[in-house]
């Protein structure tokens, strides 16, 4: 009679999160012990490490880098002059792991032609907007589109019923890419439709961030999805090793249905995003539904990540939009940013919006983490 509670207790204690945290903590303690043991009594080594720290601080001062990032490292090195320089050499590189970077770059380079900017799409824009659009098309590279309808949802519970309705209408494919998946009302509603559509022969694919979803999904989640013919990729799986590579996460929220409808915004597939559960009080995050030509950008974004890990398509045209909306809402240009290059695309877009604003700028986000450049932006006051 005590067997089931005991099993549940052990499952809670010895889960992926607990094991990962314990193993990483043990590694950190061992590395610290090894470092201090190796340097104890070795005056020449202590001097060399301090000199290394000084050189790295000078390097950071001169480096063209985000000021907040540099200051954090300089303060850490100042507090730990022996260890700080070595830590920077080990963990200071913000670039993704080599294998991840090479995979992504290979796929993106192979499909750059899929994102060529069609002529005439931005002719109606003013000069400043056209210049910004050209910048995004060049460095994204993501083109701008007319023939697109856009609908704004001010919170997740407004978006959710429409999302379910669009998923239920899928005939060819459904692509989903999210940072957080968590079992509950929201995900259960989506999963039921995905399972039914997959059984009907619809191509259903799911990418989720393994770290973001670590606490919310069962350990056999991928197996369950694959058995239901829902192909699944956990992005950058969490491993119990001390590594900055684990910091590179997939924060995107994308849904594409038949190439004609797309969703994006800040809403993940977890109950707090539709306020079915209030973990942090009322949660207010926005979402956008697009229908028409601009959906193509989201389709390519998804397929590039998918083919980096499960190479499949060499030709994306089978996933192109087939239906244009009756009502159009100006020019729409979805874009993505990543650490694969040194171009701060998203930050530059926000800086341009702030600098060009004449009357007001509305910023709506649950997470306000403003960098130095945004604080000092020369926008009109």
Q: What are these model-predicted stretches?
A:
Residues 364-368:
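NAD(P)-dependent dehydrogenases' Rossmann-like dinucleotide-binding region
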């Amino acid at each position: 009679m005590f067997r089931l509670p005991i099993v549940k207790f052990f499952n809670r204690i010895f889960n992926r999160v607990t094991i990962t945290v314990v193993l990483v903590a043990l590694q950190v303690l061992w590395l610290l012990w090894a470092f201090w043991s190796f340097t104890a009594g070795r005056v020449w080594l202590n001097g060399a490490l301090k000199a290394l720290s000084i050189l790295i601080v000078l390097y950071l001062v001169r480096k063209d880098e985000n000021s907040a990032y540099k200051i954090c490292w300089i303060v850490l090195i100042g507090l730990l002059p022996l260890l700080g320089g070595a830590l920077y050499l080990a963990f200071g590189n913000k670039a993704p792991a080599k294998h991840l970077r090479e995979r992504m770059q290979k796929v993106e380079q192979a499909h750059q032609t899929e994102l060529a900017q069609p002529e005439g799409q931005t002719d109606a824009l003013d000069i400043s907007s056209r210049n910004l659009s050209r910048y995004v098309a060049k460095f994204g590279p993501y083109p701008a589109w007319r023939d697109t309808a856009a609908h704004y949802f001010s919170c997740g519970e407004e978006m959710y019923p429409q999302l379910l309705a669009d998923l239920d209408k899928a005939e060819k494919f459904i692509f989903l890419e999210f940072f957080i998946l968590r079992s509950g009302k929201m995900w259960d509603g989506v999963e039921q439709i995905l399972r039914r559509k997959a059984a009907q022969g619809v191509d259903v694919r799911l990418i989720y961030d393994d770290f973001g979803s670590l606490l919310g999904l069962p350990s056999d989640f991928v197996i369950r999805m694959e058995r239901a013919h829902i192909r699944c990729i956990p992005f950058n799986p969490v491993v119990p090793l001390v590594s900055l590579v684990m910091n590179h996460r997939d924060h995107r929220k994308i849904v594409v249905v038949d190439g004609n409808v797309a969703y994006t915004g800040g809403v993940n597939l977890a109950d707090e995003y539709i306020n079915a559960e209030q973990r942090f009080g009322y949660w207010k995050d926005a979402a956008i539904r697009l229908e028409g030509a601009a959906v193509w950008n989201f389709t390519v974004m998804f397929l590039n990540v998918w083919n980096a890990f499960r190479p499949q398509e060499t030709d994306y045209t089978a996933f192109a939009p087939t239906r244009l909306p009756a009502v159009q809402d100006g020019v729409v240009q979805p874009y993505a940013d990543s650490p694969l290059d040194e171009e701060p695309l998203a930050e530059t877009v926000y800086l341009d919006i702030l600098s060009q604003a004449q009357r007001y700028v509305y910023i709506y986000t649950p997470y306000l983490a403003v960098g130095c450049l945004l604080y000092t932006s020369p926008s009109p006051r």
